[in-house]
Amino acid sequence: MWKNKDIYFFLKKKALLFQRKNKAKTYFILDEDELNRGIFNILGYFALSTKVLHLPEELSKNQRKKIDGLYKSVSEISTFLIGQIAKNDYNKSKITGDEILKYACYYILQASSIIGGRIVLVELVNNSKLIDFYNKNDFILLPNKTENEEKLL
């Protein structure tokens, strides 16, 4: 189902542990047509959590205020973290990445309406295809000194 070893490892070793310890919640998107026939078929999944984002020093005061919504001098901010998001390799044509991201954002909006919060964070490896995907979905790349990992809001 999951060709990517990192995805498989997360689902097999971490998802349930994070769920039990209330560190993150993992949501599976199921094929409703097959579920109605008694077949449990996962189309994709996403994991949500919270994380404190330490803002890069390079950000201007205006950029900081835009992110925080109130203050120019903020150095960190609480965020909703989309920690994992993936499609089942055997059902790629049944759901798009955009659809999975919309499901994740729906749950984040529900949480935000209850407890507040305004920033959604995605951490990912420096991969132009992934960065383009999130940019297309209105995420903004933060400047980052680390070459291997990028942060998008």
Report residues per predicted region:
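Glycine-rich phosphate-binding loop
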Residues: 93-99
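Non-catalytic substrate-recognition and accessory regions of acyl/acetyltransferase enzymes
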Residues: 1-93, 106-121, 125, 129-153
